[in-house]
């Protein structure tokens, strides 16, 4: 009898004991909430330092007084730093973990932005290099951070991240000129964005402190970053990331100046770049929703890439006062960045795989992506106008459309399938170790 009375006891306590196991849940929920806040704030930072400078290049050149070479070099520094510092991110993540790597990056970003307050060519260049190096680490580490902490919400969290990234670019492009006028200094207008990075760092500190002190596992030889370039899927992802970086940063760097030279005032030209980013915020939601549907990944990639091509043609053929049309089309086209980030985040079967893919795609992509802003600036200096640079940009946009088709063609309908050909329901890339198309 005492046996029968004690028999129900363990089952009754097992469920009860299951709840104490999740007793740290409130703390985990708090850290998860801080994580979402950090994703939002980091997203706001990632383009603010670039778009604010883009809107102020005209005023900076007048006040600081740099020549044509520096004018062509400055817009190329972000992509160059994204390539070089981005390549070191995989090593840094292995050494200290993804959370601490991001915390270090935010400190670096803040220091670099603050340096740009000094109105001299040397401090402008140094501050840009330091701040963009911090952004580079965030760029590469964030897909891994999202995968590690929000594995079942990768697409949704990537959407939040890219939407806030676009918002940061929109706000900074729109308010940088008025802010600089208010502060009576384009250098102070640039440095003011250090306030946002300080707030982000403060929000991220609890996450870094709560992180386990274990270094992230090194990628296996099959997913070692540079070996991914020998796989078809790794090569296609890297090639596409490269072409979209060339296309996007060419516009982010030069659109205001193109429109100013066409007759628009600096404030309106900055607003056009802001408008493009607003459109990106809205279209990102639709593109990510479309990409998550069976067969929708290819359509989303083609819509975004095709829109960018039309925007580049419109910018070439329409007068500056009609800038709203190309701004809308280019803004829609920027949405392809969110799509390729989702593909990177879901690449392979582990966080280490995603970090490896993110490292190689962003390092190579941004290194070659420097050809965009620098090439357009050089073509403008040599030709004395924007016709030749914009013809080159149309060619880049056409190449992006072709690569979008090839990338999504690695799956018959953009939907991941298992070995038996069954739909797994995920719009992901082939596991990277396979290295072959489906």
PLM region descriptions:
Residues 297-340:
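C-terminal transmembrane helical hairpin of 12-TM major facilitator-type secondary transporters
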Residues 84-122:
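Conserved MFS/SLC helix-loop-helix module at the cytosolic interface between two early adjacent transmembrane helices
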Residues 85-97, 283-296:
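Helix-to-loop junctions at the C-terminal end of transmembrane segments
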Residues 18-29, 209-237, 425-428:
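Juxtamembrane intracellular "pre-TM" segments in multi-pass secondary transporters
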Residues 129-163:
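Cytoplasmic helix-loop-helix junction between adjacent transmembrane helices
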Residues 53-54, 232-281:
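Extracytoplasmic gate region of multi-pass secondary transporters
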Residues 121, 152-153, 159-209:
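Helix-loop-helix hairpin linking two adjacent transmembrane segments in secondary transporters
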Residues 348-386, 393:
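A late C-terminal transmembrane helix in Major Facilitator Superfamily
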């Amino acid at each position: 009898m005492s046996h029968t009375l004690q028999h129900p006891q363990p089952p009754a306590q097992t469920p009860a004991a299951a709840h104490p196991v999740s007793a740290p849940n409130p703390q985990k929920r708090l850290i998860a909430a801080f994580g979402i806040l950090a994703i939002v704030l980091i997203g706001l930072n990632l383009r603010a330092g670039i778009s604010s400078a883009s809107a102020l290049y005209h005023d900076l050149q007048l006040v600081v007084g740099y020549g044509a070479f520096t004018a062509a070099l400055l817009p190329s520094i972000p992509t160059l730093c994204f390539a070089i510092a981005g390549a070191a991110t995989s090593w840094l993540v292995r050494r200290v973990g993804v959370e601490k790597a991001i915390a270090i990056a935010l400190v670096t970003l803040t220091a670099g932005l603050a340096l740009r307050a000094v109105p001299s060519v040397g401090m402008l260049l140094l501050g840009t290099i330091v701040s963009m190096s911090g952004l580079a680490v965030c760029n590469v580490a964030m897909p891994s951070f999202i995968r590690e902490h929000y594995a079942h919400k990768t697409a949704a969290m990537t959407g939040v991240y890219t939407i806030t990234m676009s918002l940061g670019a929109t706000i900074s492009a729109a308010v940088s000129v008025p802010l600089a006028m208010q502060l009576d200094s384009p250098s102070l207008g640039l440095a003011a964005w250090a306030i946002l990075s300080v707030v982000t760092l403060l929000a991220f500190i609890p996450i870094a402190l709560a992180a386990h002190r274990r270094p992230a596992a090194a990628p296996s030889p099959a997913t070692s970053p540079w070996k991914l370039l020998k796989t078809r899927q790794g090569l296609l992802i890297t090639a596409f990331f490269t072409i979209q970086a060339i296309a996007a940063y060419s516009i982010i760097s030069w659109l205001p100046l193109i429109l100013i030279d066409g007759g628009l005032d600096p404030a309106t030209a900055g607003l056009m770049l802001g408008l493009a980013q607003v459109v990106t915020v809205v279209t990102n939601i639709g593109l990510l929703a479309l990409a998550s549907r069976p067969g929708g990944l290819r359509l989303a990639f083609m819509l975004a890439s095709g829109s960018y091509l039309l925007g580049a043609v419109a910018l070439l053929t329409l007068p500056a006062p009609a800038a709203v049309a190309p701004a809308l089309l280019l803004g829609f086209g920027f949405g392809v960045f969110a799509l390729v980030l989702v593909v990177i985040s879901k690449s392979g079967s582990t966080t280490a795989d995603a970090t490896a893919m993110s490292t190689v795609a962003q390092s190579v992509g941004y290194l070659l992506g420097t050809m965009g802003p620098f090439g357009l600036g050089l073509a403008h200096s040599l030709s004395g106008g924007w016709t030749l640079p914009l013809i080159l940009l149309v060619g880049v946009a056409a190449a992006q459309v072709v690569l979008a088709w090839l990338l999504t063609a690695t799956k018959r309908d953009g939907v991941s399938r298992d070995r038996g050909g069954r739909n797994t329901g995920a719009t992901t890339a082939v596991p990277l170790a396979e290295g072959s198309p489906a």
